[in-house]
UniProtKB/Swiss-Prot annotation:
Disruption phenotype: Mice display sclerosis of kidney glomeruli, possibly due to failures in the elimination of toxic metabolites. It is found in: Cytoplasm, Cytosol; Nucleus. The active site is at S162, D247, H279. SUPFAM superfamilies: alpha/beta-Hydrolases. The lineage of its organism: Eukaryota, Metazoa, Chordata, Craniata, Vertebrata. The main chain amide nitrogen atoms of the second glycine and its adjacent residue in the HGGXW motif define the oxyanion hole, and stabilize the oxyanion that forms during the nucleophilic attack by the catalytic serine during substrate cleavage. Pathway: Amino-acid degradation; L-tryptophan degradation via kynurenine pathway; L-kynurenine from L-tryptophan: step 2/2. Pfam families: BD-FAE. This is Kynurenine formamidase. GO terms for cellular component: cytoplasm; cytosol; nucleus. One of its GO terms (molecular function) is arylformamidase activity.
Amino acid sequence: MAFPSLSAGQNPWRNLSSEELEKQYSPSRWVIHTKPEEVVGNFVQIGSQATQKARATRRNQLDVPYGDGEGEKLDIYFPDEDSKAFPLFLFLHGGYWQSGSKDDSAFMVNPLTAQGIVVVIVAYDIAPKGTLDQMVDQVTRSVVFLQRRYPSNEGIYLCGHSAGAHLAAMVLLARWTKHGVTPNLQGFLLVSGIYDLEPLIATSQNDPLRMTLEDAQRNSPQRHLDVVPAQPVAPACPVLVLVGQHDSPEFHRQSKEFYETLLRVGWKASFQQLRGVDHFDIIENLTREDDVLTQIILKTVFQKL
């Protein structure tokens, strides 16, 4: 299959040295609130504590299988009040497709369930066990599973961070007829994501992934939005592309260009830079109801109801 090719002018990353490219795609090197060598550990600790609190204080169903694979599990957290019709918020963790877990990713559970939203944290097989193609398939099937499990839902809102934002963006390209169900997708929130994977091939991030050029091109939503027919999701389904002020320039470029492509091909897209946050605390802060991103999520969900 031939993939859309972009010129060097359209790909400014081609002008970067290998050292600069490595820096641009190393989020920990751009943080300002903590030491680069400590930020990932802090992120995992905050996520683990939030998950432990959510499991202790919210009704939940853990390790629900959405497929036959060992890694195909998800955690479901419920509001206090019982209801057969509720919005579903699905979160896909980051970690460059090679780290991270649903077991340390329930940052937003307490603030969102307090407002009547069911929160689902999805696991997928990270590298080296899982390939990008497998991860995309797993995430897509998790959405199908939840639509079938909760057919009366008031909307599915898919949110991903970093690598998870990439996987969520790939769901925009899903062919639902293949799965025999059209999910009630009502919103996408793509946080600090990567939408063209080719720049990563020459970085250390690719060591566990072992991505080839074809792998990267096939799994780059930036390259397929305008060549794949519009999918059967709600015409007014918003796609919010968000990036932290202190994400790297390459993360900013990728987010802005993906937003512009979304607009060009007819999606209801918006772009927002969140001030004062980096690649990590943009998600860490979701433990707070008064956080900017928490409020964006609530507004996105409830303005649709």
